Amino acid sequence: MTITLAHYLILGAILFAIGIFGIFLNRRNLIILLMSIELMLLAVNMNFVAFSSWFGDTAGQVFVFFILTVAAAEAAIGLAILVLLFRNLNTINVDDLDRLKG
């Protein structure tokens, strides 16, 4: 049995759905929200690589490197904000972040 494009797309759809379920089922914990967003982004990247490999074009694979760079910066900034929020408010619960309003 060979692995076709449909297998990669199904796996990407499953990973994307897990990320969406992670966002909808747990809206309180900021770490799980960030992890779910990153999982969704990685599912999209896997689809880019699968399509570019299947069609023999390397543009999709190069585009994935740019997306991963932006995702790494997003994760670093998100975790830095998370650390600051935990230091100031002693919580990472999203519902308790209403104290930031002016």
From Swiss-Prot:
Taxonomy, superkingdom: Bacteria
UniProt-recorded Gene Ontology molecular function terms: NADH:ubiquinone reductase (non-electrogenic) activity; quinone binding
Gene Ontology CC terms: NADH dehydrogenase complex; plasma membrane
Membrane topology: Multi-pass membrane protein
UniProt keyword annotations, A-Z: Cell inner membrane, Cell membrane, Membrane, NAD, Quinone, Translocase, Transmembrane, Transmembrane helix, Transport, Ubiquinone
EC number: 7.1.1.-
Coiled coil region boundaries: none
Transmembrane regions listed in the UniProt entry: 5-25, 31-51, 62-82
Keyword Phosphoprotein on entry: no
Catalytic activity: a quinone + NADH + 5 H(+)(in) = a quinol + NAD(+) + 4 H(+)(out)
Compartments reported by the entry: Cell inner membrane
Pfam (any one): Oxidored_q2
Gene Ontology BP, a term: ATP synthesis coupled electron transport
InterPro entries linked to this entry: NADH_UbQ_OxRdtase_chain4L/K, NUOK/Mnh_C1-like
Subunit relationships: NDH-1 is composed of 14 different subunits. Subunits NuoA, H, J, K, L, M, N constitute the membrane sector of the complex.
Family recorded in the similarity comment: Belongs to the complex I subunit 4L family.
Function: NDH-1 shuttles electrons from NADH, via FMN and iron-sulfur (Fe-S) centers, to quinones in the respiratory chain. The immediate electron acceptor for the enzyme in this species is believed to be ubiquinone. Couples the redox reaction to proton translocation (for every two electrons transferred, four hydrogen ions are translocated across the cytoplasmic membrane), and thus conserves the redox energy in a proton gradient.
The name this protein goes by in its record: NADH-quinone oxidoreductase subunit K
Organism ancestry: Bacteria, Pseudomonadati, Pseudomonadota, Betaproteobacteria, Burkholderiales
Gene expressing this chain: nuoK
